[in-house]
């Protein structure tokens, strides 16, 4: 009997023992920085001359690791292995597959601070953000294992007296998992384990800036007893390996988390039926957002300011759920803006390996350059009241930036920035605020700070986002509690960590027997 699902608690670093344990995790990771990691195809570890070099975004001179890079030839080998392995893996018992997830979760739980320390070094996450990432990875495995046990016998359907009808789920086939750099453990592990526990085999292509944590996760899966060939580790260039696998006629589905433009490109390529292909590929995509916190005039204004700052600048704003727009009723606009500026100026931007750092670096030079270009746009479209500066001399650090008095149709209110920049916009009334919030091609997360019950219910109906929060920030969805995924250009309407997510990795089969 499996105990009921409960999310992994976050670590309290005010407890000295927890602080010391995390520091030990950092020391352990530092002891193997710079190591080489192989591809893994059918259990075979393959080393290539061409490497993906992972560096610490807080210290560009520090090498986190070097991961062998797959070529198209190796990607083809991995596809053949995954396709062949699927013929046996699809017949494996769901209970066995779920047990592998539970064992993997237990292994990660024992090594929790080590994995979080990898995220500090490779993704530039402060302690609390890294800890939450690792906890979410554990949650995905615990939750999806239990969900598979619920779905293993199918869903009851009606039968007449002369027949026996069954509605069951069977796996799809080979899945290509293209995971992001911003949650390089949680989302990567969630996408991968959802696919494998559903009976599919996997080609895992992690983000090129954060491949080491994925390589370490492959060790966990092996230790947990996952058979060789079920998950094949093929880091590589998106334009070479990614496109090749998306186009491949034996690819049955693609699970992607990343930018809007790449997601659209994958969706377009997957729609084409290539020679030898006998199915329409399924795409499961989460593609970002332009997320808004709406502040009503009847609201806890201190809560509003704190929610905006936490949601805008957590992990340097590099969350698809991050608050990129604060739309505030004109009667309370100045108060909330001024308080948010005060709170923002209290944030520390520094080495994320140091406990107490609020913000670390952004992901890489490309991210730094993009965010700073939007800071420049902000100087033209509004008033910069906090931040506005960056320093890429040692790492890619950007100060948390508030841009005030931004027009509702400005670029800062329309385009995804993916960095520590939030635009403040004034609304005439609550209806106007909702209209501004909905005036975007995205629809991922949003929040409303209000004490007006009628306004809360109106937003519940009319605020068109997949994850809507009231009287809290717009980030921090918990697996199994707040299934995550959005509308419009935020993706394909999938809900990671939700009760229908595994079904996206399977197909329904009806059998009817005459008695």
Curated annotation (Swiss-Prot):
<dbReference type="InterPro" id="IPR016160">
    <property type="entry name" value="Ald_DH_CS_CYS"/>
</dbReference>
<dbReference type="InterPro" id="IPR029510">
    <property type="entry name" value="Ald_DH_CS_GLU"/>
</dbReference>
<keyword id="KW-0520">NAD</keyword>
<protein>
    <recommendedName>
        <fullName>1-pyrroline-5-carboxylate dehydrogenase</fullName>
        <ecNumber>1.2.1.88</ecNumber>
    </recommendedName>
</protein>
<comment type="similarity">
    <text>Belongs to the aldehyde dehydrogenase family. RocA subfamily.</text>
</comment>
<comment type="pathway">
    <text>Amino-acid degradation; L-proline degradation into L-glutamate; L-glutamate from L-proline: step 2/2.</text>
</comment>
<dbReference type="InterPro" id="IPR016162">
    <property type="entry name" value="Ald_DH_N"/>
</dbReference>
<dbReference type="InterPro" id="IPR016163">
    <property type="entry name" value="Ald_DH_C"/>
</dbReference>
<dbReference type="InterPro" id="IPR047597">
    <property type="entry name" value="RocA_bacillales"/>
</dbReference>
<dbReference type="InterPro" id="IPR016161">
    <property type="entry name" value="Ald_DH/histidinol_DH"/>
</dbReference>
<dbReference type="GO" id="GO:0010133">
    <property type="term" value="P:proline catabolic process to glutamate"/>
</dbReference>
<dbReference type="InterPro" id="IPR050485">
    <property type="entry name" value="Proline_metab_enzyme"/>
</dbReference>
<feature type="active site">
    <location>
        <position position="286"/>
    </location>
</feature>
<dbReference type="InterPro" id="IPR005932">
    <property type="entry name" value="RocA"/>
</dbReference>
<feature type="active site">
    <location>
        <position position="320"/>
    </location>
</feature>
<dbReference type="GO" id="GO:0003842">
    <property type="term" value="F:1-pyrroline-5-carboxylate dehydrogenase activity"/>
</dbReference>
<dbReference type="GO" id="GO:0009898">
    <property type="term" value="C:cytoplasmic side of plasma membrane"/>
</dbReference>
<dbReference type="GO" id="GO:0006537">
    <property type="term" value="P:glutamate biosynthetic process"/>
</dbReference>
<dbReference type="InterPro" id="IPR015590">
    <property type="entry name" value="Aldehyde_DH_dom"/>
</dbReference>
<dbReference type="Pfam" id="PF00171">
    <property type="entry name" value="Aldedh"/>
</dbReference>
<keyword id="KW-0560">Oxidoreductase</keyword>
